[in-house]
Amino acid sequence: MAKRLLPALKYTPHTYFIKAVLASTGETVGLAGWTGPGNPCIHNIFRRSAIDYYGWKEKMGWTDAEIDEMWSHVSDENWSVQFGKDDDTRKEIFGDEPHWYLAPLLTWPEYQSRGVGKRLLNWAIDQADKTEPLTPMYLESAPTARAVYMHVGFVPQGAYNFVRRGPAVVRGLEAEEGNDAQREKLEEVSVEAMAEEMEAHPAI
């Protein structure tokens, strides 16, 4: 996957991959991919068609055989068809309105429910809430994560589409996540850009 995403980091200036790092050990415990509001178009970088859409084949010097190999183990339904439908939904919601887009957000299993995901969310939320007017945000969520996003102000727009327009707590499903005070919290976790690391180690 890293090889497929490398051109997004090299040639798409408004794409950010960040990681959560445990301060005591330097261990990576989660990561997030954000597309910033400066991006002029809506076309998910995970779609195979992004190669042609963004001109990555020429920029990376890839052959057709290399591209076929990179996508040989990938479900077209999950990675192209569904992401295409999601892009259409996002266009319907925002049109040309600048916004932040989250995909993906991952926390290593042993560190889930310990605040890592919120740190990765806050990296962009803090920036979105500093603008005037506030910059909206968008994501698609698995059913098991809906409450996490609602707790920081994301409002459902369908089965798994969410929009956030400023600070709020959307009452309802977030209660299923339990009391934050009862969760085991991590020691200090920092959030860092990981573009340089992925470029240096494309097999990651």
Roles of regions detected by a PLM:
Residues 98-102, 127-141:
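Conserved GNAT acetyl-CoA-binding A-motif
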